Regions:
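Alpha-helical cap/lid subdomain in secreted, periplasmic
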Residues: 1-101
Length: 101
């Protein structure tokens, strides 16, 4: 969370338009996110800058569970098809909607 915050602060200080996302949903564990040493950091993150998905993996797993991966037993990273679909269906519309492009 500290790295996310520092990155957001730097980009905003430099007036750089940006968006963020995660490969997997790293924010779902409420026990961790509500821990006193984490909660105050979590509450400072500007989640409006994040893509409206849980993570790249979860989005592909839900929308392209077969075509979006080469072999889930060996690699959880989306393949080229999965990345292209995520870019076309999520990233580009998000960039347009938020006047980033």
């Amino acid at each position: 969370l500290e790295h996310i915050l520092r990155t957001q602060w730097y980009l905003e200080f430099c007036n750089i338009k940006y968006f963020m996302s995660t490969f997997m949903n790293i924010f779902s564990d409420e026990k961790i996110m509500n821990h006193p040493e984490v909660k105050y950091l979590y509450e400072m993150v500007d989640f409006s800058k994040f893509l409206p998905i849980e993570g790249f993996y979860e989005w592909n797993r839900k929308n392209y569970p077969v075509d979006g991966f080469n072999d889930l037993k060996l690699d959880w990273h989306p393949n080229e098809f999965g990345n292209v679909k995520l870019t076309e269906e999520i990233i580009i519309p998000h960039l347009i909607k938020n006047n980033i492009i």
